[in-house]
């Protein structure tokens, strides 16, 4: 699987991408990741890193390795232009933690994007779960879709409604952040992700619209809005899973779950928070026997 020079510049230059993975119920969760330019054009692979401390994401990918990465924002990266790139593929099995690989390969690869890592007696201990237990996830690329100029949306059949119904279950989070993505499971079983406009409606739903199109019918879907500064400092994230009803480029989204996060705008405070979250997640993963 190859791709153009224009696409390669985006895969190699974007600071963040939207990782979409499939839930056990057949929905999609979208979360920003830092791909730090990881890709092998000759081998047809892309990648990103994550920590064993964030085990739920890894568990979902292990259960269903069909994933997608939406390269949708040029902010604070090295690529230019407004081309939207959606890469769909199959994630390889999660490898064991390899601190030498992280230090010697991933560290230098990440430095232009994230800045040099904090080092020293305190930081080495505090960020152990975040850095030393970090792994590179490699994705064997199946499809590279671009927009404008290409189709991002297939024609998957409607899904059966959940037992608890399709109406909104939580109050919509504000979608007034610069970057918004909506995703669902496409006809081939891979997540499909499009950029959207999103506004809360009086009935508790979120009105969504995408010039790239939406799949006709009803289905589970994931929605995310996010913003970030250089080196992902000050990352703000608002996520929903829920139910999408669409016809043409417009639809109504009923939020069923919500999650939000706002990182400190100071890098030192951000790393302190990252270390705490990763250590807590790793402790839970070990207690559950998944690490």
Predicted regions located by residue number:
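Short, conserved active-site entrance elements at the starts or edges of catalytic domains
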Residues: 1-15, 20-21, 153-183
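Short coil-to-beta transition motif at edge beta-strands of beta-rich domains
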Residues: 13, 64-67, 176-177, 215-226
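Short beta-strand segments
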Residues: 14-53, 69-73, 79, 83, ...
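Short beta-strand segments in beta-sandwich/barrel cores
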Residues: 17, 67, 91-93
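Short, solvent-exposed aromatic-acidic interface loops
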Residues: 50-55, 257-261
